[in-house]
Every structure is written in structure tokens, then in C-alpha cells.
Amino acid sequence: MSPRPPKTRVKLDPLDLAGIDDMLSAEEKAVRAAVRQVCASSIDPYVAEWFESGDLPGVRDLAKELGKLGLLGMHLEGYGCAGMSAVDYGLACLELEASDSGIRSLVSVQGSLAMFAIWEHGTPEQKQEWLPPMATGEAIGCFGLTEPDHGSDPANMRTKARRDGDGDTADWILNGSKMWITNGSVADVAVIWAQTEDGIRGFVVPTDTPGFSARLIKHKMSLRASVTSELVLDGVRLPNDAVFPEVRGLVGPLSCLNEAR
């Protein structure tokens, strides 16, 4: 009977049991290191206080800092976006998540929902107006799909948009509400999905439009270092060029959710 070979011990890194580091390029590791550094300097020292207070003071300054690093819409091409890979984006989100899920939510909702919706479905004018300032953090966006009564059933959303007049160039009037909207109370622009006679349509809504309001949701059990809001649209009048021109139906919002996830 031949002797058993000696056992070899494999030294495992408890922080990298799957050996992911060996699969990353030098550039990808550099992206991760840069995000880790900004988390250590600008998020980690304050996140416990933010969690306790249930607030994110200085969110605009933080957004600008993240924008300087290229983290806002970082996987999109053009319009001032970094055009990085999905791996880069995933590594950045992992580092942000390690600091706090609320901060990761700020970045992913800005880039993968609000910015992606405009980038994918918007007109050239909508893209040029909003994407460059959103990429730098000068403008913050939110994504209005979930509703108080239809969070997981967007096909039955109650928010309505109707034409005010005849013809294809008439203004739109929006009425309804959205709930649990990340960035809502600090957003400069909201992507709002609403029922129309032609199915669900998407609208680019500047948040200073009369009839638009946002209420901060407090006393949350989780994502406390995140701005979460209820949006109310009370007779919000928008010009025809505020609508996404081509996309209709659930394919619009669901394409954005697929991108974000």
C-alpha cells in the first residue's frame, strides 16, 4: 500500500476566498483602489453619524466628489461619462457598499436608473441638457416608478399623463405619486413613468416645475444614510419635448431596472 502524499495547505485570503484579485487587471485594481480611498476619507469617518441621524447632509458635495472620480454614470459612453467597463462599475459599487449601502444607492440610482433612462431613451436635446451635469454631480437625478399601492406591479400604476389640447405637440399634464424614491428630495431632475392613452411613457421632469413636490421619508429601518422620498405630481405641466419619444410600455422602465441590476 503506497503512502499517502503529504497534505498541502492552501493559504486562503479571507477577504478574497474566490481568488477574484488574480482575475483583475492592473487598471481594474486601480479603479478599486481609488474608490476605496475616497470611501476611507469622505464616507467612512461620517457614515455612523449619518446612519444615526437618518440623513445625508452634504449630499451635493459628496455627489460632486464622486463625479470628479468618474463614478456617476461611469459605464455610459459620451456626454462626460467615463465609459468604463461593467467590471469597473461592479468593483466601484462593491467598495461603496462596503462603506454603506445608502451611498452605493446614491451612485447606482443616479447612473443606472436616472442617467441610463435619459441616455437610452432620451432625445439628443434631453441627453445634452442633463447627462453632462449629472456625470459631474452638479445635477442629481431620481427615478420615479414605484408607487404607494403598486410597488411591485408597475403595469397598474396610477400616475397618469394626459394631453392638454389636440395634436401631437400639446403639453402633457401629470398627476400621481411615487414612493421610496432614492435621491427624490435632492434631485434636480426626475424620470417619471406614467400611464397614457398609448401605454406607459417616460418623462423628464425638472423638479422645480410647478406642481412637483418631494417629501423626505424618515424613521427608516435600513438605508438610513440615503435620501428616500415620496414624489407628488399635482397638475405638473410639461412641454411635449419632455417625453421620451420612442419607448412605450413596460419595456422602458424595465430596461432601466435590468441595467441597474
Language-model-detected regions and their locations in the chain:
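Amphipathic, small/basic residue-rich leader segments at the start of a protein or domain
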Residues: 1-106, 126-129, 133-136, 167
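Glycine-rich beta->alpha junctions and the first turn(s) of the following alpha-helix
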Residues: 20-24, 31, 213-261
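N-terminal glycine-rich flavin-associated loop
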Residues: 105-125, 151
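A short, Trp-centered hydrophobic/proline-enriched beta-strand micro-motif
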Residues: 137-145
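Active-site-adjacent elements of ketosynthase-type condensing enzymes
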Residues: 149-158
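Glycine-rich phosphate/pyrophosphate-binding beta-alpha loops
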Residues: 151, 179-185, 259-261
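A structural signal for short hydrophobic beta-strand segments in well-ordered beta-sheet cores
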Residues: 159-163
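A short core secondary-structure module
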Residues: 170-171, 175-215
